[in-house]
Amino acid sequence: MTFKTVLENDKVRIMRARMDVDAREGLHTHAADTIVVHLSGGEIEDTANGKTVVNHWKPGDVEFEARGSSHSARNVGKPIDVVLVALK
């Protein structure tokens, strides 16, 4: 997954990110409450707490990742572009 910071200040860090087909993010823990806005649709296989689900995202969908939440992810569809807003 590639990340590019587009704005950062004492309140937020805003990043654009792209996850290519079959790209994987290993197990990681979110350091901040993060809002994810999907710019493109696709499918992400998400594993957390021993459970694996495939999420189907459409352009404009929004999700929330809580500070301290842990999971791994794999893109099982087409390339996905998102904007991440991490609250400080």
Range-by-range predicted roles:
Residues 8, 50-68:
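Short acidic-glycine-tyrosine-enriched beta hairpin
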Residues 10-24:
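Extracytoplasmic/periplasm-facing segments of secreted or lipoprotein envelope proteins
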Residues 24, 43, 61-62:
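Residue-level marker of beta-strand positions
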Residues 67-88:
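Ligand-binding loop in jelly-roll beta-barrel domains
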Residues 1-7:
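Local beta-strand/beta-hairpin segments that build beta-sheet-rich folds
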Residues 29-45:
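Short, conserved beta-strand element in jelly-roll/cupin
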Residues 25-27, 45-46, 70-77:
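Short beta-strand His + acidic residue motifs that chelate non-heme Fe in jelly-roll/DSBH
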